[in-house]
Amino acid sequence: MNIHEYQAKEIFRKYGVPTPRGGVAFTGPEARRVAEELGGNLWVVKAQIHAGGRGKAGGVKLAKSLDEVEKIAEEMLGMTLVTHQTGPEGKVVKKVYIEEGADIKDELYLGMVLDRALEMPVMMASTEGGMEIEEVAEKTPEKIIKVAIDPAIGFQPFHARKLAFGLGLPKDEQREFIKFASALYNVYMDNDAEMIEINPLIKTGDGKFLALDAKMGFDDNALYKHPEIAEMRDLDEEEPTEVEAKKYGLSYIKLDGNVGCMVNGAGLAMATMDIIKHEGGEPANFLDVGGGANPDTVAKGFEIILSDPNVKSIFVNIFGGIVRCDRIANGILQATEKVEVNVPVIVRLDGTNAEEAAEILRNANIKNIIPAENLKDGAKKAVAAAKGEL
């Protein structure tokens, strides 16, 4: 789960991670009031969407008067912001964050992620603040300094010193940086975050460090421990079909291809997408119906997959362990009665009661339900069907 910049900064401040003062607004007059309360003569108006690259897309603007704050906010609210992370459809701006202007001496990058290879959190820093970190990693990876942190000992001063030396910070700034980085580590660990990114982390004229931007992502499986963070979820920023799928216990992620996938188990779902690619196709989604699949969840799965107009075929790939294949076969037939399935459905069922399942599908004699002998055969048929070649 991701949250907005203003929400991430609220969490930062609770842990003593310094940020500029600011407030959220939903209308132009509200934005003006926030700027008035902040005082000063320079403000930044920032579109609040779950995507990076806002500045380049016109979603971050400076204002030098209260009138300008109101005008920029009114122009920004309701606009569709298209960045490299939103896709071509973009995201509609429904709120803006008004922040006091800052005295920027230098821009840095600081972030934390979980390194799955090392099985440890990693803190990363770079002198290339303000740039896309993916671009820095691709073109000048030597400019990214990393430290892996063993949770058993936690974040230590030597971790921060390594980052500070790599950033070339003078001695009089290192103590302030160590304090900042230590607080950020606590934010990450205490809240079960998956990712934190501050880009840019700025140095001010008086040698202070401020989080000028803030991104946070959380482990959905840990949200039950953090109800106050779960309340920050903005469903408007999420794919509607993904939200709908969660209500039925389905794990669904929309992709850009045309071969719909319905699979039980995340590992098998990933393998299914891989083999579709291998056969020359493009998966339209990731959909894990889980171990407790029943006719209702299968029907809902079809409904969600078919809500994507790009889907030209569906590959149902089920390995029956806990869930019986005959139950899935009956679920598929019941689903076709509830939902208009107007594309070829290639079905590969293996495992518990697979033969009974094959018999059920054969006896049903439904034209667009096509059995597959194995995984490879199923993927080939699904890709061919999507291309209109089956």
Curated annotation (Swiss-Prot):
It is an enzyme of class 6 (ligase). One of its GO terms (biological process) is tricarboxylic acid cycle. SUPFAM superfamilies: Glutathione synthetase ATP-binding domain-like, Succinyl-CoA synthetase domains. Mg(2+) binds at residues 199, 213. GO terms for molecular function: ATP binding; magnesium ion binding; succinate-CoA ligase (ADP-forming) activity; succinate-CoA ligase (GDP-forming) activity. It catalyses: succinate + ATP + CoA = succinyl-CoA + ADP + phosphate; GTP + succinate + CoA = succinyl-CoA + GDP + phosphate. Residues 9-244 form the ATP-grasp domain. Its cofactor is Mg(2+). The keyword Transcription does not apply. ATP binds at residues 46, 53-55, 99, 102, 107. Belongs to the succinate/malate CoA ligase beta subunit family. PANTHER family: SUCCINATE--COA LIGASE [GDP-FORMING] SUBUNIT BETA, MITOCHONDRIAL, SUCCINYL-COA SYNTHETASE BETA CHAIN. HAMAP family: Succ_CoA_beta (MF_00558). This is Succinate--CoA ligase [ADP-forming] subunit beta. It comes from Nautilia profundicola (strain ATCC BAA-1463 / DSM 18972 / AmH). The lineage of its organism: Bacteria, Pseudomonadati, Campylobacterota, Epsilonproteobacteria, Nautiliales.
